[in-house]
From Swiss-Prot:
InterPro entries according to UniProt: Alkanesulphonate_mOase_FMN-dep, Luciferase-like_dom, Luciferase-like_sf, SsuD_RutA_monooxygenase
Protein name as annotated: Alkanesulfonate monooxygenase
Keyword Oxidoreductase (UniProt): yes
GO molecular function: alkanesulfonate monooxygenase activity
GO terms classed as biological process: alkanesulfonate catabolic process
Keyword Translocase: no
Transmembrane segments: none
Stated family: Belongs to the SsuD family.
Family matches, as Pfam families: Bac_luciferase
Species for this entry: Variovorax paradoxus (strain S110)
Taxonomic lineage from the root: Bacteria, Pseudomonadati, Pseudomonadota, Betaproteobacteria, Burkholderiales
HAMAP family referenced in this protein's UniProt entry, alphabetically: Alkanesulf_monooxygen (MF_01229)
E.C. numbers: 1.14.14.5
Length: 389
């Protein structure tokens, strides 16, 4: 099981839907979050993409030197990037980071934003373009280890003599991750990607998506790994966790929800449609209505696009829910919480010891790394918990 965190390059706050409790997103703050994730033992961080975010490649590059082991899941965007340029970017980043790049293939689902970026393709055409893009990208990188060039002629993209002189550290190329809920997305995942990601839907729905992608891949003689994107709200007691969830949306007003849902409704993203359906397009507001599956809460999606659900509960409960998802075949969990710095620590301290995961040792010196807690009465270190042994 691999646990990832998230860099909030589109903003961070104690509350959703308001500037109250917000904090500036600058390099120093992102370095704090990345450094914490690196030290705490998270496998890597997802860096979001889109016009609401800072550029993910610039952000990721600025954090290479501030981290030692942390991996970076960074987006390539068919239609915005050319595949040969994206291949060079990926190879350079992988080389400079010592093999710490993961690539997130993002097709896009907001027609208005895409047209602003010069992409005038419908849903089906975007997936055709994405399939051509990632095929060219993969071939250029794979052939770079032997110095070969690549030719390709497609409906949307063509290259002649495409060649990369500096190969990536990872062979044949940095792993490709990808998320999408439509049939076209599942077909692309089955044919070309290494890891398929889903947003946090109820386990039964996630199981159906996994089965569909897995079956499609098997027919092509391939296997695909699986991951999930979730928020987490964990506190020492169940009541405290639900209180924190309610507090997170306590500043959200009706006008903000209506405006957000109208924006989501114009998108042609199947994943976004499924997220909105979990709270009936913003109509559901109470805890009972928003708890769509045990401890799975859809309140985040009232105003946040993309991943809109959170696991809410005490450490044992949240760990148990994660293990339930893992039993479906998921082994990659991309998590986040508000604010992202504090919650990175909280989740690692409270939940990591309860998960069936290989601990990531980030600090040299073995026993010097702790955790110990403050020395008692200037005499002894506190007793070590059984879960820490």
């Amino acid at each position: 099981m691999q646990i990832f965190w998230f860099l909030p390059t589109h903003g961070d706050s104690r509350y959703l839907g308001t500037s109250e409790g917000a904090r500036p997103i600058d390099l120093a703050y992102l370095q704090q979050i990345a450094g914490a994730a690196d030290q705490l033992g998270y496998e890597g961080v997802l860096i979001p993409t889109g016009r609401s975010c800072e550029d993910p490649w610039v952000i990721a590059s600025s954090l290479i030197g501030a981290t030692k082991n942390l991996k970076f899941l960074v987006a390539v965007r068919p239609g915005l990037h050319q595949p040969s340029l994206a291949a060079r970017m990926a190879a350079t980043f992988d080389r400079l980071s010592g093999g710490r790049l993961l690539v997130n293939l993002v097709t896009g689902g907001d027609q208005s934003e895409l047209e602003g970026d010069g992409v005038y393709l419908d849903h089906a055409q975007r997936y055709e373009q994405s399939a051509e893009f990632i095929r060219i990208w993969r071939e250029i990188l794979a052939r770079s280890h032997s110095g070969q060039a690549f030719d390709y002629e497609g409906r949307h993209l063509s290259v002649k003599g495409a060649k990369l002189l500096y190969p990536p550290v990872q062979e044949p190329y940095p792993p490709v991750w990808f998320g999408g809920s439509s049939a076209a997305a599942h077909e692309l995942a089955a044919e070309q990607v290494d890891a398929y990601l889903t947003w946090g839907e109820p386990p039964a729905e996630v199981a159906r998506k996994i089965a569909d992608v897995r079956n499609r891949a098997a027919r092509k003689g391939r296997t695909v790994e699986f991951g999930i994107r979730l928020h987490v709200i964990v506190r020492e007691t169940e009541d405290a966790a639900w209180k924190a969830a309610e507090e997170l949306i306590s500043r959200v007003d009706d006008e903000t929800v209506i405006r957000a849902q109208a924006a989501f409704a114009r998108m042609d993203s199947e994943g976004q449609r499924r997220m909105a359906a979990l709270h009936a397009g913003g109509a559901r507001r109470s805890r009972a209505e928003l708890e769509i599956s045990p401890n799975l809460w859809a309140g985040v999606g009232l105003v946040r696009g993309g991943a809109g659900t959170a696991l809410v509960g005490d450490p044992k409960t949240v760990a148990a829910r994660i293990e339930e998802y893992a039993a479906l075949g998921l082994d990659k969990f991309i998590l986040s919480g508000y604010p992202h710095l504090e919650e990175a620590y909280r989740f690692a301290e409270l939940v990591f010891p309860l998960l069936s995961r290989k601990a990531q040792s980030r600090l040299a010196g073995g026993s010097l790394s702790g955790p110990f807690g403050e020395v008692v009465a200037n005499l002894d270190a506190p007793s070590r918990l059984a879960s820490q042994s």
